[in-house]
Structure formats: structure tokens, C-alpha cells
């Protein structure tokens, strides 16, 4: 990570350099990402395992890719009670917000005419939560809670493991609290390809 010290003397140069960066300059990555997704499409789980080893340094296989209830219980033991309270309070707030967005399928006009459209939740949703060196329990909540409120039946979450093959405890606790049905230890483009 590069740390920039913003002072009156450096402010102008730093801001100009930041503004020069193009948000649409993805050309160098697009080819690599497409190749990974194609490899996952063709070689399925084995490609996911290979890329997880290559990018995350973790030995993931069919026997350990799915987070177990034991791993979740262990995560609860490792998470500070203050963080758990914050996760639970945030979950309640996010849920209340999204409950106000739920659409009714039908409504009645002043004349008594029933109008509307059938609003139906998706059966399954895939949620990708970044991980690695940083931890994002808020991303877990902001993705899973709206899906739960919408009535999604099955929520599958992926997040990268550490080199030890484990997922950050706060990420697991947030996922359990939010209602993830399955959590897989895989990140990056290979996770997106597998979800698709």
C-alpha cells in the first residue's frame, strides 16, 4: 500500500496524479479475467482449486471448500463481543431499511381496480465478499440482508481464504448472522466464474 502525505506543498501534485488515473483502464486485466473464467467453465472445480492455490496460497479441494458448522462455531469464539454486537445492530438497521423497499405485487386504485405485477424473489443468489488482507463484514451484511428481505431461498457466499485455508472469523460470523446458506472458501475471478 502506498501512503500519500497530503500537505499544502504536495496537495496539488497528488490530486492531479489521482485525477489522471482512468477508471476505465481495465484492458490489462480483462484478458486475464476472461481466461480464468473460461478455465473455470471448462475445468470447473479443479480450476477453482488451482487458482485458489495460485492466488491465495491455500490448498482447497472438494473436501474443505465449504465452510463447516465447526469452523463457524470456532469463528464465534474468536470474534470480540463488541464486534458481534456491532454486527447484530448493523444487521437490524440494514434489514429495517430494506424492508421499506419491498414491493407489493398488486395495489387497488381509487376506482377499485386491481393493478400490478408479480414481484418474485430469485431462488438462489451468489454473493462475493472480498477478503485476503482486508476484512469486510459490512459487505457481507450489505449483500446478504437485502437478499433475505427480498425472500431469496438460497444464498451462496464466496470469500477468499487465507494461506491456512481459513476464512476470517468476522466474515464468517457476519455471514452466519445475516443468513448465508452456504459459504465457500474461494475468491477472485474464479469465485465469480464458479458462481455464474
Each language-model region and where it sits:
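A glycine-rich helix N-cap at a beta->alpha junction
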Residues: 171-191
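Positions that flank functional sites
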Residues: 55, 162-163, 190
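Glycine-rich anion-binding loops and their surrounding alpha/beta cores
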Residues: 2, 185, 193-196
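Short acidic/polar active-site loop segments enriched in Thr and Asp
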Residues: 44, 153, 181
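Conserved small-residue-rich beta-alpha loop and adjacent elements
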Residues: 108-173
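N-terminal Rossmann-like NAD(P)+-binding subdomain of aldehyde/semialdehyde dehydrogenases
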Residues: 1-122
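An acidic, phosphate/nucleotide-engaging active-site surface
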Residues: 114, 191-194
Amino acid at each position: 500500500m502506498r501512503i500519500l502525505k497530503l500537505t499544502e506543498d504536495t496537495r496539488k501534485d497528488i490530486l492531479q496524479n489521482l485525477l489522471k488515473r482512468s477508471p476505465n483502464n481495465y484492458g490489462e486485466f480483462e484478458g486475464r479475467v476472461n481466461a480464468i473464467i473460461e478455465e473455470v467453465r471448462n475445468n470447473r472445480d479443479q480450476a477453482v482449486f488451482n487458482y485458489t492455490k495460485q492466488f491465495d496460497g491455500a490448498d482447497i479441494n472438494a473436501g474443505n471448500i465449504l465452510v463447516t458448522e465447526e469452523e463457524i462455531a470456532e469463528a464465534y469464539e474468536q470474534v470480540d463481543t463488541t464486534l458481534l454486537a456491532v454486527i447484530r445492530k448493523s444487521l437490524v438497521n440494514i434489514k429495517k431499511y430494506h424492508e421499506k423497499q419491498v414491493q407489493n405485487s398488486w395495489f387497488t386504485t381509487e376506482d377499485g381496480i386491481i393493478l400490478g405485477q408479480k414481484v418474485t424473489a430469485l431462488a438462489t443468489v451468489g454473493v462475493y465478499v472480498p477478503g485476503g488482507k482486508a476484512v469486510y463484514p459490512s459487505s457481507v451484511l450489505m449483500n446478504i440482508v437485502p437478499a433475505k428481505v427480498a425472500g431469496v431461498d438460497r444464498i451462496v457466499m464466496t470469500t477468499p481464504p487465507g494461506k491456512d485455508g481459513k476464512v476470517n472469523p468476522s466474515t464468517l460470523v457476519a455471514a452466519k448472522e445475516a443468513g448465508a446458506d452456504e459459504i465457500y472458501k474461494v475468491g477472485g475471478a474464479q469465485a465469480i466464474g464458479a458462481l455464474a
